[in-house]
Amino acid sequence: MEVRVRYAPSPTGLQHIGGIRTALFNFLFARAHAGVFVLRVEDTDRSRCTAAFEQNLYDTLRWLGVSWDEGGGCPETAVKQGARGDGRSVAHAGGAYGPYTQSARTDLYRAQVARLVETGQAYYCFCDASRLERVRKIRTLNRMPPGYDRHCRELLPEEVRECLASGVPHVIRFKVPLEGSTHFRDALLGDIEWQNEEINPDPILLKSDGFPTYHLANVVDDHAMRITHVLRAQEWVPSTPLHLLLYRAFGWQPPLFCHLPMVMGADGHKLSKRHGATSCDEFRNAGYLPEALLNYVAMLGCSYGEGQDLFTREQLCAHFSLSRLNKSPAVFDYKKLAWFNGQYIRAKSDEQLCALVWPFIANAGVCGHIPADVEAGAVRTRRFADEAPCAPTEAQRSMLMRVIPLIKERLRFLTDAPELVRCFFQEPSLPEQGVFVPKRLDVAQVRAVLVRARGLVHEIVSASEPDVEVLLRAEAEKFGIKLGDFLMPIRVALTGATVSAPLVGTIRILGASRSCARIEHVIRERFSDDSQGVGGG
């Protein structure tokens, strides 16, 4: 049997960590079994679904390197245009079971619902909004669970025909059995049984506008697309008995279900905005590498072996198995993800890292003015921080290639790069005097250090690495201060910041002349009125 799985989100928002984890597990499962990964868009909620969010789905998966074999948004396959039903059009990928957007499949859903009506397993409901609101209030008052009261379930055929002939607005509801239970075996959670009386009473299958509800479209599409395994979040467990009843009503074999563990924040609640970034776009714009995010998300609720954290996509595909999934919720650890990101950044070659950090540097305006026409064109097309407005000049690229080895160990995110490299492309800002003065030094001592630094930079540029360290320690001892306190004023003078790339490397790249000029500028602007402690140089 060919394994066929799917990721079927609704394009009602940006792709978030929970959805990406579901997509990734389906992708890995398909690859582990040489199967097919289908991407289906469930856009039946016409009031909330947008083309922009659908495009975000495709962009996100492509950025992560999660490829699909059938589905929408695939430029690699033959494409045709299909009507969405709302005046817009969308590209549908090739595949034997398309289209892969539900709004283009409404005829199929209506035909299948008609089958259920004919066999007495679904019925027309003519209750209007005011009556349904009265039912809701009564059930709430009587402390009954929410749901329909089955008022139209036993309408006589002639009553139904009369209402239809009169054009009374209607929906079509499913007849949930009034007794008995529905049982299924979940691949992760084991045996689950649900009393039919606890299932939402006679849910709507087809809405008054002719569009299907999620439950109908989900079941019809999974059957029509030959889906063999459904891997989805545990929040869908309560819906599974209804889906199984629909499979039974249609006379279809259901797929194997596997409900994945929830993704929680550190406080034990479902991961949400209050915990931090949750959408893939946020992580992308914050300077995370797709490989790092993919690797970390793949480990949320799944174990791949002891003693190893970093896996390539190919290794994840080879190791993934439903037997490796954990039943308990996974906790999203932002610090651990940051560690992953740093590891992947440092594994990049200087050439690769130069290309990766350039967009963030250019977008931060570090490398100078971007021509207005170039910037205007870039603004129209650029949606992510890792999309550059222009390519670097040869001089900019050459400078970056010298700086990258200096900053690589200090990068946790690509967004760290602009401030670390700014001093190599621009004259630094001039902080207030207090920024130059460590807690254990006074203003006079700092001025003396800076005066001495003017002469030191020439020696630093020409000396070997071991000799430079000996030289700097000796100078700090002459002043009777710690090495870190000795270097701090020099660092701020050269970079404008208390945190920077390694100081010796910075001086060598800037050169003696440029370094001396910056130190002179600081002495003149911030320490010219202080004549104390000039000695020591």
Curated annotation (Swiss-Prot):
A motif ('HIGH' region) lies at residues 9-19. Its cofactor is Zn(2+). One of its GO terms (cellular component) is cytosol. Its main location: cytoplasm. It is found in: Cytoplasm. Its EC number is 6.1.1.17. Zn(2+) binds at C125, C127, C152, E154. GO terms for biological process: glutamyl-tRNA aminoacylation. It is an enzyme of class 6 (ligase). A motif ('KMSKS' region) lies at residues 270-274. Catalyzes the attachment of glutamate to tRNA(Glu) in a two-step reaction: glutamate is first activated by ATP to form Glu-AMP and then transferred to the acceptor end of tRNA(Glu). Belongs to the class-I aminoacyl-tRNA synthetase family. Glutamate--tRNA ligase type 1 subfamily. HAMAP family: Glu_tRNA_synth_type1. This is Glutamate--tRNA ligase. It comes from Treponema pallidum (strain Nichols). The lineage of its organism: Bacteria, Pseudomonadati, Spirochaetota, Spirochaetia, Spirochaetales.
